[in-house]
């Protein structure tokens, strides 16, 4: 896809007016039943706009959080199921993409085979990968089995990926990064608050129960647990926190392969990369050197049997969702219930659809686009994106805290955005992937194929800017700093985000803010450190950067002050980038909305002005119900603010919202103008 060329404001306004006029007037897009008018707009705009929706959509046992994204995902799941079952009902040529989709889905749905015959497959997997119950192991196990298991998707003591070199963005670079943590991040291992202690105790219960279910005695299962928690805690203490990982400069450390072997001699790098299928490594990026040094120490100091137990656990944990029902139930009891508060697992068909989507996402996406994504939706979305680019450029131009020199570079970066809408221009080739009748074998084959594809397409090769990092059916969007691209998959281009039947007040308030959000990521605390080519490079003047940091500190402090549960505050540092993107998305989209309707103002509908409908549409994107366990988990690990605070924490800093609803200092949400965040 070529870069969209920016048109003049008048031309864009005419285009926008044309798409909102015609023989049939467009609707407001606002469902009044979603509102709860027992609240005043300035009391809690979130409850005012979405309280009715929350009452009408109580949490079911399957969900720990249910909101607009989930409504759309449910609809997508039904559409994907229809596509998959349609393919499965056909006669498909062996080796065809259709056969692979059908076979993977059938293997996931075959509960009889999963429950009666899983053990042979699991035993074959474990023995093939070197786990021997006799404990007859050698040092070769560490050298050879470790990377083989990683090839099949079993997490190792560290991670490896091939992606763009952040300081030479046209070329790919091997990246080595911290890993080995079943719980995902260090806080769960090092924090001592009662909630974290509860999670660790539930983790112990899960490890022991799953190991016993697979035939280990209670004594052996507890020994496995002791080895797992000891070694994972060692790795956690040497790892960086989620907030520390947000600093791109601090996590960039490129060295030659020779230097890698010299500085980290405790790992047999030659054997590791050969077993992965990567010979000829020239350079690597060590994101978190301290964590890799701790891996060396663990390999040197821990008994081989203990290391083997860790890998056994990682393999069992990975496999537990793809074998018998009891293993899956134990997995869900921990990840679903203990960590998130869910009371009931997803039905088998949803899990099966998710597996097909994860393994054959673009193949399924091609069918999805052909059936469910009209060309006119792509065209209108591209016009909206172009309008938002103009508006962001206008906002950059009027910022008094930026020098003209920095503004010029920022505008150049904005003009260089690579815009992707709907679906990729080229599709993945799955011809070398083999799918059979065993669910676990299929998942292992898919994992290995993904790694081989990464090596084949990226190792010692330039970056392919046409690669998509989400499938077309994904209900999400992204900005990628190393390619300076914004991407909006077809899956999100549906109500309540995008509605071809609704007017511009709705679409700018919903999908328009999403567009502006992703664009602003190019200028948030992280994205602003990358230039228009995607290179990590300081392009700001020192004075401008200092003024920028002062402004974002206001946002950080405001969100730190938010109490999401009694005694639990939001983490304004972890959520800083997303909060900046929400704020920028609102500011930019509202300006684009004003530009688009300047020549043809929209009417009042259902008693709401166009400006009011803009903010109501925005709030409805974030309506949700959520369990306390899920809130605690997200505050610890999610860089996004909770839905309520993406509304009530953002709108008090938007002057246009005050004007639209007549908010005054008597309203609880009122923030004095001098204290409001003003960045873009």
What is each PLM-predicted segment?
Residues 40-43, 48-113:
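Active-site-surrounding "flap" and adjacent substrate/cofactor-binding loops of secreted or lumenal enzymes
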Residues 34-55, 189, 193-212, 576, ...:
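Hydrophobic/aromatic-rich, well-ordered segments within soluble, folded domains that form packed cores
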Residues 2-9:
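Sec-dependent signal peptide recognition
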Residues 86-383, 387:
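Noncatalytic, helix-rich "gating/capping" subdomain that lines the substrate-entry/channel surface
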Residues 15-18:
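C-terminal motif of bacterial Sec signal peptides marking the signal peptidase cleavage site
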Residues 20-29:
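Bacterial Sec signal peptide processing site at the extreme N-terminus
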Residues 5, 73, 228, 263-266, ...:
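Intrinsically disordered, low-complexity linker/terminal regions across diverse proteins
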Residues 62-84, 219-238, 507-513, 606, ...:
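Short secondary-structure subsegments characteristic of cysteine-rich extracellular domains
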């Amino acid at each position: 896809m070529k870069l969209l060329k920016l048109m003049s404001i008048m031309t864009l306004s005419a285009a926008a007016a044309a798409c909102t006029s015609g023989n049939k007037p467009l609707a407001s897009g606002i469902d009044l039943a979603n509102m709860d008018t027992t609240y005043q707009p300035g009391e809690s705009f979130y409850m005012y706009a979405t309280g009715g929706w929350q009452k009408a959509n109580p949490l079911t046992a399957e969900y720990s959080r249910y909101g607009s994204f989930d409504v759309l995902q449910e609809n997508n799941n039904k559409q994907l199921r229809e596509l998959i079952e349609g393919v499965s009902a056909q006669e498909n040529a062996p080796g065809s993409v259709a056969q692979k989709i059908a076979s993977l889905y059938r293997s996931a749905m075959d509960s009889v085979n999963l429950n009666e015959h899983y053990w042979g497959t699991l035993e074959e997997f474990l023995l093939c990968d070197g786990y021997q119950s006799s404990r007859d192991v050698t040092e070769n196990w560490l050298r050879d089995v470790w990377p083989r298991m990683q090839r099949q998707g079993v997490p190792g003591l560290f991670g490896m990926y091939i992606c763009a070199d952040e300081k030479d963005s046209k070329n790919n670079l091997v990246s080595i990064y911290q890993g080995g943590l079943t719980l995902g991040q260090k806080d769960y291992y090092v924090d001592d608050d009662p909630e974290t202690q509860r999670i660790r105790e539930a983790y112990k219960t899960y490890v022991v129960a799953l190991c016993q279910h697979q035939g280990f005695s209670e004594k052996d299962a507890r020994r496995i647990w002791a080895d797992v928690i000891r070694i994972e805690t060692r790795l956690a203490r040497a790892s960086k926190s989620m907030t520390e990982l947000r600093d791109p400069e601090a996590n960039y450390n490129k060295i030659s392969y020779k230097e890698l072997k010299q500085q980290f001699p405790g790992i047999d790098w030659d054997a590791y990369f050969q077993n992965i299928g990567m010979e000829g490594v020239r350079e690597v990026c060590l994101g978190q050197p301290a964590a890799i040094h701790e891996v060396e120490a663990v390999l040197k100091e821990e008994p081989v049997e203990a290391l083997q137990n860790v890998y056994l656990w990682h393999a069992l944990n990975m496999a537990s969702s793809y074998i018998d029902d009891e293993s899956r139930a134990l997995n869900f009891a921990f990840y679903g219930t203990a960590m998130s508060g869910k009371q009931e697992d997803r039905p088998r068909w949803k899990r099966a659809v998710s597996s097909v989507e994860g393994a054959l996402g673009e193949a399924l996406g091609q069918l999805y686009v052909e059936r469910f994504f009209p060309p006119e939706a792509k065209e209108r979305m591209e016009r909206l994106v172009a309008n938002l680019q103009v508006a962001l450029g206008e906002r950059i131009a009027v910022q008094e805290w930026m020098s003209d020199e920095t503004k010029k570079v920022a505008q150049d970066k904005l003009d260089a955005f690579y815009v992707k809408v709907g679906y990729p221009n080229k599709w993945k080739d799955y011809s070398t992937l083999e799918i059979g009748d065993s669910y676990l074998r299929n998942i292992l084959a898919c994992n290995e194929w993904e790694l081989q594809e990464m090596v084949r397409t990226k190792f010692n090769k330039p970056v392919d800017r046409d690669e998509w990092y989400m499938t077309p059916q994904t209900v999400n969007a992204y900005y990628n700093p190393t390619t300076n691209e914004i991407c909006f998959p077809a899956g999100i281009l549906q109500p309540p985000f995008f509605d071809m039947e609704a007017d511009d007040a709705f679409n700018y308030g919903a999908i328009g803010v999403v567009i502006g959000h992703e664009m602003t990521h190019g200028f948030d605390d992280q994205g602003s450190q990358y230039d228009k080519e995607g290179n990590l490079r300081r392009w700001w003047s020192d004075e401008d950067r200092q003024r920028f940091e002062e402004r974002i500190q206001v946002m950080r402090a405001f969100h730190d002050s938010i109490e999401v549960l009694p005694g639990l505050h939001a983490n304004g540092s972890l959520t800083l980038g997303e909060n900046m993107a929400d704020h920028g998305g609102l500011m930019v989209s509202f300006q684009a909305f004003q530009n688009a309707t300047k020549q043809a103002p929209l009417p009042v509908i259902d008693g709401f002005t166009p400006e009011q409908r803009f903010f109501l549409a925005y709030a409805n994107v974030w309506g949700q119900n959520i369990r306390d366990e899920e809130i605690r988990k997200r505050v610890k690990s999610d860089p996004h603010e909770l839905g309520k605070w993406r509304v009530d924490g953002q709108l008090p800093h938007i002057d246009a919202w005050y004007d639209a609803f007549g908010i005054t200092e008597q309203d609880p949400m009122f923030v004095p103008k001098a204290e409001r965040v003003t960045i873009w």
